[in-house]
Swiss-Prot record:
Protein name, per record: Uncharacterized MFS-type transporter YfcJ
Membrane-protein topology: Multi-pass membrane protein
Example of a GO cellular component annotation carried by this entry: plasma membrane
Localization of this protein: Cell inner membrane
Upper classification of the organism: Bacteria, Pseudomonadati, Pseudomonadota, Gammaproteobacteria, Enterobacterales
Pfam families: MFS_1
Primary location: membrane
Entry superkingdom: Bacteria
Family membership: Belongs to the major facilitator superfamily. YfcJ family.
Gene: yfcJ
Organism name: Salmonella typhi
Amino acid sequence: MTAVSQKTTTPSADFSLFRIAFAVFLTYMTVGLPLPVIPLFVHHELGYSNTMVGIAVGIQFFATVLTRGYAGRLADQYGAKRSALQGMLACGLAGAAWLLAALLPVSAPVKFALLIVGRLILGFGESQLLTGTLTWGLGLVGPTRSGKVMSWNGMAIYGALAAGAPLGLLIHSHFGFAALAGTTMVLPLLAWAFNGTVRKVPAYTGERPSLWSVVGLIWKPGLGLALQGVGFAVIGTFISLYFVSNGWTMAGFTLTAFGGAFVLMRILFGWMPDRFGGVKVAVVSLLVETAGLLLLWLAPTAWIALVGAALTGAGCSLIFSALGVEVVKRVPAQVRGTALGGYAAFQDISYGVTGPLAGMLATSYGYPSVFLAGAISAVVGILVTILSFRRG
């Protein structure tokens, strides 16, 4: 056991973890690039309502949550590397469906259907990618550094959102939706080339509890994560339309502000969950997220909205890893992939449900109301986290 622990903390293991995280960054650009563009494509080019915008964005996360169990079993039983590489391939295929939606001379309903197919494929790929890379990273550096694994992967994900959002709007405005789709096809292939030679980690043996018994161990941190996720979901789905409705520019840079603050917090304070435990870090983070969403709700100018997005990103930054540390503590090694997949599924459910519900809210009460709803959810998340872990 000592030999294994020493091996998992070598510089070579850290470099392998970096390669995995950078590959996640490249692959997750397939999420970041189209995220601010899809609402514009659905609402303005296809002529559909806010609710349909919410469905187009949110359905990806339903696909992700429905395949989390499969992704966890794949990582636990057949190896995390296989799960991660399979996810990259699926993310690339999503771009092919969007390319067909852009190029085929078909009606708006058919284009929308192809867009949905691509979102479903992307959701499937995302579940394999994230579950695989988290389990892979834990196998490389060890469970005592689970916070680091989650922090690095989180930086990669939200760094991709920060870079991808304005780049996606730029590509779309200058070259069209087809060029955006083609770009999303290529990036996962580059990611595969970058980390394909990182060593495998063995699958753990031992008795494997049922999925529902694992969920019983992780639902409390998962619920806190889900309530946190509402804030990002409303920003990712409606920030472009919110800016357009106010006549503001720089909508893509809102996600850059969110993602940049997210990554900066991970760089400066990513060590905190391992050092202080997840609960305290999560509660403070949810307070910061609440402040950012309230600022977005009340923003009189684009610059204030950017500050609100940055505060929200700073608040969201450490919550996944903070509560994820609690998940790793609660489950045996042979089901870590299943547990992490199930834990992340709570966030996927939040993203998926928030899109269409927030769309109906925006139609009835205007775009600012969705950010107020996100702030209320974060406050509920604080209460849930405190009450769930009060005995600890």
